[in-house]
C-alpha cells in the first residue's frame, strides 16, 4: 500500500504526502513503477497542466527528491530506451521550469536520447529546445536525421525555424539524399515556408540520390507557386 501511495503522491505532485511517507519509510525512495521508472522520473513526467497546478509545484517535488539523494542521471525506461530524468521532463511533462531546474542541478542534456532535441521538436517546445542547446545538446545530432529535418517533416515549423535560426544545417540530406526543401515540395508545404527556408540558407539545387533537386521537382508540379517559392 505504501508503495502505491508514494507513486501516486509523486505523480500528483503532492509534496506533503510524499514527505510524510518518506519520513516514515525512507526505503520508499527506491520504489519504481511497473515501467521501471523511479520517483524522480515520475516527478519529471508529471503534467502541471493536467493537474492544474503551477509549474513550480513540479520544481519543488524534483528539488525535494534530489535533496533526498536521488541520482539526477539514473535511467528509467521510456518504451525500450533507458532515459535520464531530464528526458522525461522534456518528453512527458514538457515543463521548462523542471528542465532548467535539472540543468541547474547538474543534469547533462547530452545524456538524453538525441540530446532531448527530437522530443522537444516533436512537441514544438521552443523554450525547451533553447534550454537544451544552451546546455550543450548538439544541434545537428543525427538519429536517422537531424532534429531540424525531423521537426520540418513533422510540420513542427516553429521548432524547425528556431533550430534553423540557431544554426542547424538546413541542407542536411537524409539517407535518400533529400533535404528539407525536397520534403517540403513533395508534401506541398506552404510556399511561404519554402521561401523562408531558402532565405535562411536552404539550396533548391541539391540533388537527391535520384539526381532530382527541389527546383526540378517543383518545376514538374502544375501549381507553379512551389517553383516560384524557390526563386
List PLM regions with ranges.
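Eukaryotic tandem repeat interaction scaffolds
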Residues: 115-175
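Alpha-solenoid repeat scaffolds
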Residues: 28, 46, 50, 72, ...
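Ankyrin repeat domain, specifically the short helix-to-loop turn at the C-terminus of the second helix
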Residues: 22-27, 60-71, 100-108, 130-138, ...
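A generic tandem-repeat structural signature
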Residues: 58-108, 114-116
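Ankyrin-repeat boundary/"N-cap" motif
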Residues: 2-6, 31-49, 75-88, 110-119, ...
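Ankyrin-repeat-protein effector appendages
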Residues: 1-5, 135, 166, 193-195, ...
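Ankyrin repeat A-helix N-terminal signature
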Residues: 8-13, 42-58, 88-95, 119-125, ...
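N-terminal alpha-helical scaffold/docking segments in eukaryotic complex subunits
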Residues: 7-11, 21-24
Amino acid at each position: 500500500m505504501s508503495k502505491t501511495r508514494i507513486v501516486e503522491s509523486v505523480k500528483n505532485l503532492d509534496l506533503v504526502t510524499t514527505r510524510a511517507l518518506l519520513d516514515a519509510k525512507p526505503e520508499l525512495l527506491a520504489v519504481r513503477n511497473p515501467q521501471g521508472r523511479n520517483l524522480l522520473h515520475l516527478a519529471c513526467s508529471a503534467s502541471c497542466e493536467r493537474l492544474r497546478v503551477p509549474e513550480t509545484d513540479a520544481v519543488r517535488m524534483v528539488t525535494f527528491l534530489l535533496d533526498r539523494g536521488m541520482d539526477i542521471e539514473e535511467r528509467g525506461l521510456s518504451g525500450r530506451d533507458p532515459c535520464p530524468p531530464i528526458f522525461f521532463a522534456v518528453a512527458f511533462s514538457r515543463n521548462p521550469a523542471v528542465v532548467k531546474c535539472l540543468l541547474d542541478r547538474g543534469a547533462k542534456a547530452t545524456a538524453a536520447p538525441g540530446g532531448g532535441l527530437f522530443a522537444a521538436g516533436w512537441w514544438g517546445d521552443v523554450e525547451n529546445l533553447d534550454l537544451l542547446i544552451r546546455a550543450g545538446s548538439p544541434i545537428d545530432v543525427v538519429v536517422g536525421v537531424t532534429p531540424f529535418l525531423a521537426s520540418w517533416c513533422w510540420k513542427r515549423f516553429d521548432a524547425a525555424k528556431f533550430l534553423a535560426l540557431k544554426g542547424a544545417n538546413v541542407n542536411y540530406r537524409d539517407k535518400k539524399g533529400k533535404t528539407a526543401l525536397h520534403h517540403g515540395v513533395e508534401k506541398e508545404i506552404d510556399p511561404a515556408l519554402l521561401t523562408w527556408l531558402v532565405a535562411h540558407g536552404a539550396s533548391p539545387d541539391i540533388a537527391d540520390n535520384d539526381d532530382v533537386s527541389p527546383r526540378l521537382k517543383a518545376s514538374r508540379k502544375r501549381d507553379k507557386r512551389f517553383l516560384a517559392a524557390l526563386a
